């Protein structure tokens, strides 16, 4: 493909009401939007596999990798989704506010479950320019014979598009942060935002820091997985002690058996729990699971008084868990909080005051 430059086409009728309502209301929302885009891309690729239009490799692992580069003042998001062709970048990126998710649903509305497609407005990607002076996209489509594409824009107005060098199907979006947004070049700040918005997304999300020292862990050899990177094999010889038996005679007794262990590169831990408790049937949940979920979500280490598991399909689809906390004294805060998720993506904390009539 030939390298070319251009200006973005903005469908303002769709775009600007959305900007006024929410795009700039929360400075950290761009992370939620970019991760949601990656999740959508993975969901679409899986659906193409289900419909027989694509065959996923046997070792396919749906995931989103977020990498913080503190020295480079950048933040990248890499998904293993369906990627984009040059024409699709033109359609979904260069024409702002034309939603790829909406178009995908329209094409496959009779075959795909639209509830699992997160994007609706096509603006998620452009939230990146809330914090970045320059943004690049490196993408390779799932389509046979597709050419990798590299897209770059400064300020979200003009762009340059050329042939890329991405080898694996999927998309990497890299944000080169502006000076007033360098807080997002901090691993702990990004982890905080990912935990806030993406703890229950249906795809595993991994966070790492560019240039970080490799960490290791030691496990029993029988726990070794195919994807583990073995650094060292360790043998712990059996331990024995000399003890006196019931006859008063001394004998050597094995107190710890011989163990074979391996030192491996530390396994990454996903930030997201892909199947949150509210998605399960109430009959499949234990009291301990309900209590632990309450503690982790609401940061309240007192046990709830009781709870109601909501699982409605009519007149609308609603799943959730309504907890009633214990109130020990008259000084305890009685104001409730509802945590609202749409397709497992955190939307907002809703105070009880919002439901009170004026």
Predicted regions and their residues:
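GHKL (Bergerat-fold) ATPase N-terminal catalytic module, capturing the glycine-rich phosphate-binding loop
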Residues: 1-179, 183-184, 192, 199, ...
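GHKL/Bergerat-fold ATPase module in large chromosome/replication-associated machines
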Residues: 117, 135-158, 178-182, 188-358
């Amino acid at each position: 493909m030939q390298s070319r430059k251009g200006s973005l086409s903005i469908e303002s009728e769709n775009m600007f009401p959305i900007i006024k309502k929410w795009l700039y209301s929360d400075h950290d929302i761009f992370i939620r939007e970019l991760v949601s885009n990656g999740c959508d891309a993975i969901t679409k690729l899986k659906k193409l596999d289900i419909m027989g239009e694509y065959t996923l490799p046997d070792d396919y692992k749906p995931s989103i990798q977020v990498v913080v580069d503190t020295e480079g003042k950048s933040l990248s998001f890499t998904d293993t989704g369906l990627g984009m062709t040059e024409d699709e970048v033109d359609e979904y990126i260069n024409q702002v506010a034309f939603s790829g998710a909406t178009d995908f649903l329209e094409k496959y509305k009779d075959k795909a479950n639209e509830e699992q497609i997160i994007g609706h407005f096509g603006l998620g990607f452009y939230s990146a320019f809330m914090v970045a002076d320059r943004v690049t996209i490196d993408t390779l489509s799932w389509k046979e014979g597709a050419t990798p594409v590299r897209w770059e824009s400064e300020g979200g107005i003009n762009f340059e598009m050329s042939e890329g060098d991405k080898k694996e199907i999927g998309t990497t979006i890299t944000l080169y942060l502006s000076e007033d947004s360098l807080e997002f070049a901090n691993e702990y700040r990004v982890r905080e935002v990912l935990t806030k918005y993406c703890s229950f997304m249906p795809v595993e999300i991994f966070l790492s820091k560019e240039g970080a020292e490799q960490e290791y862990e030691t496990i029993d050899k029988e726990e070794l997985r195919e994807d583990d990177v073995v650094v060292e094999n360790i043998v712990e010889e059996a331990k024995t002690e000399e003890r006196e038996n019931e006859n008063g005679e001394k004998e050597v007794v094995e107190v710890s058996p011989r163990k074979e262990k391996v030192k491996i590169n530390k396994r990454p831990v996903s930030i997201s729990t892909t199947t949150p408790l509210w998605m399960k049937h109430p009959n499949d949940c234990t009291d301990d699971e309900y209590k632990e979920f309450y503690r982790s979500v609401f940061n309240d280490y007192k046990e709830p008084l009781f709870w109601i598991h909501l699982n409605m399909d009519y007149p609308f689809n609603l799943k959730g868990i309504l907890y009633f906390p214990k109130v020990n004294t008259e000084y305890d805060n009685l104001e409730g909080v509802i945590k609202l998720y749409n397709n497992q993506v955190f939307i907002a904390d809703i105070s009880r005051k919002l439901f009170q009539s004026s």
